[in-house]
Structure formats: C-alpha cells, structure tokens
Amino acid sequence: VGGYAVCYHGYFRTTGDLDLWVAVEPDNARKLVQLIREFGFDVPELNESLFLQKGRIIRMGEPPTRIELLTEISGCEFAECHARRIEAMLDDIPVSLISLPDLVHNKLKAGRLKDLDDARHLS
C-alpha cells in the first residue's frame, strides 16, 4: 500500500516511506516483533500489542528510508484484499501488493488530497 504500490500500478511519484499493511493476528504480531528486533529496531515500547489493534501506525526510521507498518487502511478489510493481492518481483524479491481496484478504493476512502490525486491518476 502507499507510494510504492501507487508507482507499481503506473503513477510514478515520490514517496518518503515504505508502507506495509500487516494482518492483525497474534501469530503475526509475535513474528513482527521478532523480525523488528532482528533488524535492530528494538525499543522498550516494542511489544505484540502494538500489532493487535486496528488503526495503528508503527514508524521506523526517517524519510526517505522510513518504514511504516499499518494495522488498518481506509475502506479495506485485510483478508478480502489479501485474497485479491498481486504477487510481483521487485529487485528479485517476491512481494505481495494490493490490487489496483483495492488501492483506488483505499485512496478514495482515505480522502487526503495526495490520496485523491493518486486515485485520479490510477483510474
């Protein structure tokens, strides 16, 4: 989701971060905390509960290399979008991306000027 997905789907623009939408599930939360610690982002506030509440944004780093982990995005349900995801290779790395219809729907529901501009260019 976010600027990288927008670019993948054909509207090339700058972005200051990588937005990753994560499922709100206990096993997923445990794996995320472990992975983040392995990457060296361990802070006292890091715990599984951060990933078990919808509407959370966990930010790591500073633009332009910031990573944002989102537990919810506007107008979309994770399981439904995950079922319609696109599997792609980016720099020889397999990634799952939100489908174009789901991305446009999300952008319209988010409603910020930047999101509406993305939706207009992607439609």
Regions found by a protein language model. Name each.
Residues V1-S123:
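Compositionally biased terminal segments of proteins
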